[in-house]
A protein has these predicted regions:
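Short beta-strand/turn micro-motifs composed of small residues
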Residues: 2, 139-141
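Alpha/beta-hydrolase-fold enzymes
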Residues: 2-95
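Active-site nucleophile elbow and catalytic-triad environment of alpha/beta-hydrolase enzymes
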Residues: 91-92, 107-127
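Acidic catalytic loop of the alpha/beta-hydrolase fold
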Residues: 95, 112-115, 141-146
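Conserved alpha/beta-hydrolase "acid-adjacent" motif
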Residues: 97, 120, 144-151
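A structural signal for short secondary-structure junctions
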Residues: 127-132, 146-150
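Short beta-strand/loop motif that positions the catalytic acidic residue
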Residues: 131, 137-139
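Catalytic histidine neighborhood in serine/cysteine hydrolases
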Residues: 155-158
């Protein structure tokens, strides 16, 4: 997971949908599920939604275009995996669900929604000036479906 100085409305909406998907999985049971009976379907679908938002449309096109998976990997059912992009989402979602607890995800994502560094000084700049470190590492990625490129530039100003 990653976070910024504050969540923008699009990010709030995406995480809200992800939490709703997890909570609507019957296996969630209000958060009282056994470790081996976690809401895997909800977690996988929520992860797929997140994965789609982490890349810009052009990157999806360049990476996958309309490539199909090999015929020996297809089941023949009309709604099973057929495209490489579907296979990518499926693989990464299934990897995620066995390495992350659903309740932990729900609470961590909500905490990320609530956090706003401007709450600690009145503005992002004021909030960041309260952080006393010699060096800070800011890792940036190309703009995605859900990010705004100018957020990193704002951090460099402080």
């Amino acid at each position: 997971m990653s976070a910024a100085t504050r969540a923008v409305p699009f990010t709030l909406a995406m995480r809200s949908l992800q939490r709703e998907i997890i909570r609507s999985d019957p296996a969630w049971k209000g958060g009282n599920y056994a470790a081996n009976e976690a809401p895997y379907s909800g977690m996988a679908l929520a992860r797929k939604l997140g994965l789609v938002s982490y890349r810009a449309a052009e990157e999806w096109h360049q990476r996958f275009d309309r490539s199909r998976i090999s015929k020996d990997r297809r089941t023949g059912a009309p709604f099973e995996l057929e495209f490489e992009v579907e296979s990518y989402l499926d693989y990464n979602a299934n990897k995620f669900i066995h390495n992350f607890d659903a309740n932990s995800y729900l609470y961590l994502s909500r905490a990320m929604d609530w956090f706003d560094v401007a709450d600690h000084g009145g503005s992002v700049n004021s909030g960041l000036t309260k952080i006393h470190v010699k060096t800070a590492l800011i890792i940036g990625v190309p703009p995605t479906f859900s990010s705004r490129q100018n957020n990193k530039e704002k951090l460099f100003v402080v």
